[in-house]
Amino acid sequence: MDIKACYQNAKALLEGHFLLSSGFHSNYYLQSAKVLEDPKLAEQLALELAKQIQEAHLNIECVCSPAIGGILAGYELARALGVRFIFTERVDNTMALRRGFEVKKNEKILVCEDIITTGKSAMECAKVLEEKGAQIVAFGALANRGICKRAHSHLKAQEGACLPSHLPLFALEDFVFDMHKPSSCPLCATSVAIKPGSRGN
């Protein structure tokens, strides 16, 4: 399955000057919501991702996503894996588990995002779950921006990666684009970074 083509066909691979939720600036932005607005395509992508996870023979009892960007991807992945789905959300800028969601002690959970950049949001989600007694067994995403190391990829983890090295990250593709710290972003010389989606917008 050509993941890059899926994003291009959905007009979800945007070019410009963007502020990512990780804080980095980039000339490309992956707008997964545009891909996931097609339920059939969302199902196909989730089935592809589930296949990778099932081949790893992991015992997963639940999928959890940080709101809002990860919710559709996480729900479809949970459906493909045949497990329940929950999500965390920000309250006063702090990640929390709400809406009556509960986790059991030692419940094995995969944290799923639509896109993994540094993995910061995924780790905030994981921390909430671990504090409630859950066991994080893996991370998942439709796409990995190449900072974190994913299973079945030759790319190594880069500076800024937040995901733990002892847990696998499953994703359908690596999208490696230039990313810059705001203090050294060459794009800022000619334009102002915009934030087309995700945290805070």
From Swiss-Prot:
GO BP term, pick one: UMP biosynthetic process
Catalytic activity, as annotated: orotidine 5'-phosphate + diphosphate = orotate + 5-phospho-alpha-D-ribose 1-diphosphate
InterPro entries reported in the protein's UniProt record: OPRT, Orotate_PRibTrfase_bac, PRibTrfase_dom, PRTase-like
Role this protein plays: Catalyzes the transfer of a ribosyl phosphate group from 5-phosphoribose 1-diphosphate to orotate, leading to the formation of orotidine monophosphate (OMP).
Pfam families named in the record: Pribosyltran
Gene this protein is translated from: pyrE
Homology family: Belongs to the purine/pyrimidine phosphoribosyltransferase family. PyrE subfamily.
Protein name (database record): Orotate phosphoribosyltransferase
Biological pathway: Pyrimidine metabolism; UMP biosynthesis via de novo pathway; UMP from orotate: step 1/2
Record keywords: Glycosyltransferase, Magnesium, Pyrimidine biosynthesis, Transferase
EC number(s) from the headed UniProt entry: 2.4.2.10
Subunit structure: Homodimer.
Species in which this protein is naturally found: Helicobacter pylori (strain ATCC 700392 / 26695) (Campylobacter pylori)
Single Gene Ontology MF annotation: orotate phosphoribosyltransferase activity
Binding site for 5-phospho-alpha-D-ribose 1-diphosphate: 113-121
HAMAP family with a match to the protein in the record: PyrE
Enzyme class, broadest EC rank: transferase
Record flagged with keyword Lipid biosynthesis: no
Names of the cofactor(s): Mg(2+)
Residues binding orotate: 117, 145
